[in-house]
Amino acid sequence: MTGNSSNGYGVSLVGSGSATPSQIVSNDQLALRVDTNDEWVKTRTGIRERRIIGADESLTDLCVAAAKAAVDMAGWGVESIEMVLIATSTPDDLFGMAPKVQSKLGATRAVAFDLTAACSGFLFGLVSAAQFLQNGSFKRAVVIGADQLSGWVDWDDRSSCVLFGDGAGAIAIEATAEEDDLIGFKMKSDGSRGDCLNLAQKRNFVPLVESYQTQKGDFSPIKMNGQEVYKFAVREVPSLLKDVLQTYGIVPESLDWLLLHQANQRILNAVADRFSIPHHKVLTNLANYGNTSAATIPIMLDEAVRDGKVQSGHLIASSGFGAGLSWGVALFRWHGPF
């Protein structure tokens, strides 16, 4: 799928927020449970620690906190929000987490729904929400990326448990009659390679009546072929990014920042090197949070905005990629107040 705004309104990115759990689990602490060590994890992934939701926290609460921060930065009243879209694969309620977040946020006018696209989820969610603003259906929306992967990993599998963490990030976007900040995007999927990274439903059947059976709802832990996912990312992300840059007439040198899904530092560096983008232009906080799936991009963007790295008018190339397999690239300008 390809697109940008050609009719109607533009979209402006005007606020960001993020929230992470209070529990911080270091590589050394994980080494008390599985056969690993800090150097092994850092060398292969770039991760030093991750945040894990504890007994007194919930993903819903993190979403609300992130959304409030984004709305406050934008200077909105919550009553002006018309859409709350949450990209998540791990909602607190399988029927949808967004309506509860909408209620706790006080955005009583907003339609609220979830979108599931794993690590590509936030980018897909941003593009999806933008369509409603560009065609005039809504004026203001909050897009949230949030996941609690700690509940779905096998904590005795050292190859996967060291990778993931929990968190939520949010972006406030609004329709504008001025130039569109969402310059363009492309999104792709390939379900034939879905077994490389999945969180599959268990096929557990229990007696129902007479000779009939019914499937009991349950899921297996996250399963990942790390080598295949790495090869997928370093092949497909640069290819699609090159396509998007050429389509919209942008040279890599004009980018202020490269903002990739925070999966593995080797992937981030490999994509940057393909375009001769200096590593200091690659936004990364992977060392502190690990892979938080749909939350990585908005958490990183919020941190960079609040740290003064990303400033109003900066041009950003962003890519989400992962389970599905799905991946996408978006070009946008930050228009927030910082």
From Swiss-Prot:
<feature type="active site">
    <location>
        <position position="119"/>
    </location>
</feature>
<dbReference type="InterPro" id="IPR013747">
    <property type="entry name" value="ACP_syn_III_C"/>
</dbReference>
<dbReference type="InterPro" id="IPR016039">
    <property type="entry name" value="Thiolase-like"/>
</dbReference>
<dbReference type="GO" id="GO:0004315">
    <property type="term" value="F:3-oxoacyl-[acyl-carrier-protein] synthase activity"/>
</dbReference>
<comment type="similarity">
    <text>Belongs to the thiolase-like superfamily. FabH family.</text>
</comment>
<keyword id="KW-0275">Fatty acid biosynthesis</keyword>
<comment type="function">
    <text>Catalyzes the condensation reaction of fatty acid synthesis by the addition to an acyl acceptor of two carbons from malonyl-ACP. Catalyzes the first condensation reaction which initiates fatty acid synthesis and may therefore play a role in governing the total rate of fatty acid production. Possesses both acetoacetyl-ACP synthase and acetyl transacylase activities. Its substrate specificity determines the biosynthesis of branched-chain and/or straight-chain of fatty acids.</text>
</comment>
<comment type="subunit">
    <text>Homodimer.</text>
</comment>
<feature type="active site">
    <location>
        <position position="261"/>
    </location>
</feature>
<keyword id="KW-0444">Lipid biosynthesis</keyword>
<dbReference type="GO" id="GO:0005737">
    <property type="term" value="C:cytoplasm"/>
</dbReference>
<keyword id="KW-0808">Transferase</keyword>
<keyword id="KW-0443">Lipid metabolism</keyword>
<dbReference type="Pfam" id="PF08541">
    <property type="entry name" value="ACP_syn_III_C"/>
</dbReference>
<feature type="region of interest" description="ACP-binding">
    <location>
        <begin position="262"/>
        <end position="266"/>
    </location>
</feature>
<keyword id="KW-0012">Acyltransferase</keyword>
<comment type="pathway">
    <text>Lipid metabolism; fatty acid biosynthesis.</text>
</comment>
<keyword id="KW-0511">Multifunctional enzyme</keyword>
<dbReference type="GO" id="GO:0033818">
    <property type="term" value="F:beta-ketoacyl-acyl-carrier-protein synthase III activity"/>
</dbReference>
<protein>
    <recommendedName>
        <fullName>Beta-ketoacyl-[acyl-carrier-protein] synthase III</fullName>
        <ecNumber>2.3.1.180</ecNumber>
    </recommendedName>
</protein>
<keyword id="KW-0963">Cytoplasm</keyword>
<feature type="active site">
    <location>
        <position position="291"/>
    </location>
</feature>
<dbReference type="GO" id="GO:0006633">
    <property type="term" value="P:fatty acid biosynthetic process"/>
</dbReference>
<dbReference type="InterPro" id="IPR013751">
    <property type="entry name" value="ACP_syn_III_N"/>
</dbReference>
<dbReference type="InterPro" id="IPR004655">
    <property type="entry name" value="FabH"/>
</dbReference>
<dbReference type="Pfam" id="PF08545">
    <property type="entry name" value="ACP_syn_III"/>
</dbReference>
<keyword id="KW-0276">Fatty acid metabolism</keyword>
